[in-house]
Regions:
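Conserved acidic-Pro-Pro-aromatic motif
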Residues: 25, 29-117
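Glycine-rich adenosyl-binding loop in Rossmann-like folds that engage adenosine-containing cofactors
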Residues: 1-37
Length: 117
């Protein structure tokens, strides 16, 4: 159930592609990965998705956040649909305590979010 390599090359796994650095990338919902692998609990979710973090977080159903204990993510204010304040607000509303790690006024940084389960 931990074989995520199958998502690398499958065509049409999801009907959305994103043009990035002169190549198309196949995208899928995190919900689909959780469902297909029958994941009941995720202790640690690391997200480094180069500006897609807002789309990904907004696509996760509310009840699926209950499965995720900790999220560590890189954010990109200049390209994501959600800036770091909006991400922290979203995660706080889902029951997470968030810590922001950002150098000065940089457009990117890290968010550490955890919840008691």
């Amino acid at each position: 159930k931990n074989d995520f390599k199958k998502y690398r090359d499958i065509k049409n796994i999801y009907n959305l592609t994103r043009h990035f650095k002169n190549s198309n990338k196949i995208l899928t919902h995190l919900k689909k990965i959780i469902d297909e692998n029958s994941l009941e609990k995720i202790d640690y979710l690391k997200m480094d998705c180069e500006g897609s973090e807002g789309h990904i977080l907004k696509s996760i159903p509310n009840d699926y956040f209950l499965k995720i204990r900790s999220i560590v993510m890189e954010f990109h204010n200049n390209v994501s649909i959600l800036n770091h304040n909006q991400i922290i607000h979203l995660l706080s509303n889902k029951g997470y305590q968030c810590i922001l790690n950002r150098n000065n006024n940089s457009e990117f940084g890290y968010i550490f979010a955890t919840r008691n389960q």
